[in-house]
Amino acid sequence: MAGLDTNVLVRWLVDDDAGQSRRIAEMLESAARRDETLFVPLTVMLELEWVLRSRYAFAKPDILLALNALLETRELEFQTEPAVERALHAYRQGTADFADCVHAAACWVEGKAPMLTLDAKAAKLADAKLLAA
């Protein structure tokens, strides 16, 4: 199993470079034929959301659609997948940034919730708590 960098997933999702997109599709097809998976680090998911939002102007619904599509891709294996799923659910339901959703979900997965924060939006997450003054 190999790991993937953010730029590979960006190229695959936005499909703005035919040559690179073709190479990525071939890589995924090859992994499927060998019944292998490719590893996606949690930090890649954080960076991917940021790139889609800031560089490609994806709106929140489009980001959710893209990230959920990745989770459904059989050839991809995610670091701490329960945290990714929980973060996406929290992001879909609330107003907190995706990064805060990931941080809180990662705390939850490790049994360290709530995540203490000074961010009022993040504090509304089920796995977070506003640090009182």
Label the model's feature ranges:
Residues 11-13, 51, 125-126:
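Residues that scaffold the ATP/ADP-binding catalytic core of kinase and kinase-like folds
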Residues 8, 44, 83, 102-103, ...:
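Alpha-helix capping/helix-boundary segments
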Residues 104-133:
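Acidic, PIN/NYN-like endoribonuclease modules and their adjacent C-terminal/linker elements
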Residues 34-38, 75, 111-114:
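Short active-site oxyanion
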Residues 1-40, 55-62, 68, 132-133:
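Short, well-structured N-terminal submotif of metal-dependent ribonuclease cores
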Residues 4, 39-40, 78, 98, ...:
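Short beta-strand scaffold positions
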Residues 42-43, 65-93:
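Acidic catalytic patch
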